[in-house]
Every structure is written in structure tokens, then in C-alpha cells.
């Protein structure tokens, strides 16, 4: 029996929206505007960067950042490559973050350096002290054996993390 609806992924939906309404506004943030075509371009660029890091379908990627365009780029890019988004509440602190990373078996953590008074980077260093002496992509934290990558949006993240650029 044929399906009565077409099965689509979130990544496919973005591609279709960009094809149908390429010039229409898809996203606004802090006075900036992105059309569907521009959003798709950013998402595809982000997906290619993730693939270059070695991310693949099934990888769990913890996303711990406030609302901003990069959150959306990341979400759709991960959907396109088949990775699993592990959203983390931005009100969580060190012990909560550690629990989510451990429970989810995340291979990658994506976050910001800081947002307002909250220093996310300091909390990452607190639970992953080896980050400062690691090479990007070669993180080894006993508590989080699957975690290999930390990607930081904002200030220079230090030796062991990738910088979002």
C-alpha cells in the first residue's frame, strides 16, 4: 500500500522552502535578515564543516547555546547529515551539563563562550579540564568517553576546542 504522504527530513523541508520561496524572509535576529536561500546556504556551509570534522549519521551532538542564528544553522545542518541533536537547556550549569553529556554519549559539544553574565566556556573547562591541553578533535575525558569535539562560538576557545568561524 503506498504512503498517503511524502516522507521528508527536516533538512529536505528547508531545501524545499528555499526552492519555493528563496527570496522570502526566513529568519530575523538582532536587526539582520536572512532569506530562505541565504539560510540554506548557511546551513549547507555548516553541514560541510561538520562533515569535515568527521561527524556522521547517528552521532549525538549536544547543543548548548542561547537562541541565535547559529543554533538554527546547527540544528538543520545536523538534520541534513543525520546526526542526533541533543538540545541542552541554557539554564543548566556544570553538573547538569556533565549529566547530559554522560547520558547522551555525545561526540560533540557546541556552545558559546558566554552569554550575558553566564560563562559557558569556564563551565566546559571545569568538567573537561583536559580541553586546555588537547588538540581539537582529540579530546579525552574519562567521564565522557565518546566526547571528541568541542566547538565554541565567540572568543578564541583555547587549545583543545574548535572555533566556530
Protein language model regions, located:
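Short, P/G- and charge-enriched loop/turn segments at secondary-structure junctions
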Residues: 1-4, 137-139
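Conserved AMP-binding/adenylate-forming core of the ANL superfamily
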Residues: 2-15, 23-68, 72-76, 93-98, ...
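Structural core segment of the AMP-binding/adenylate-forming
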Residues: 53, 81-165
Amino acid at each position: 500500500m503506498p504512503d498517503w504522504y511524502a516522507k521528508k527530513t527536516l533538512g529536505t523541508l528547508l531545501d524545499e522552502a528555499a526552492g519555493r520561496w528563496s527570496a522570502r524572509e526566513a529568519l530575523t535576529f538582532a536587526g539582520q535578515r536572512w532569506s530562505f536561500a541565504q539560510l540554506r546556504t548557511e546551513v549547507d556551509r555548516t553541514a560541510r564543516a561538520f562533515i569535515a570534522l568527521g561527524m556522521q549519521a547517528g552521532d549525538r551532538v549536544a547543543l548548548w547555546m542561547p537562541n541565535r542564528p547559529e543554533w538554527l544553522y546547527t540544528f538543520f545542518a545536523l538534520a541534513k547529515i543525520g546526526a542526533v541533536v541533543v538540545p541542552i537547556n541554557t539554564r543548566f550549569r556544570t553538573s547538569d551539563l556533565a549529566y547530559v553529556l554522560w547520558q547522551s554519549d555525545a561526540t560533540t559539544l557546541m556552545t558559546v563562550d558566554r552569554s550575558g553574565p553566564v560563562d559557558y566556556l569556564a563551565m566546559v573547562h571545569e568538567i573537561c579540564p583536559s580541553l586546555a591541553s588537547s588538540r581539537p578533535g582529540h579530546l579525552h575525558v574519562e567521564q565522557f568517553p565518546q566526547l571528541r569535539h568541542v566547538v565554541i562560538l565567540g572568543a578564541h576557545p583555547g587549545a583543545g576546542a574548535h572555533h566556530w568561524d
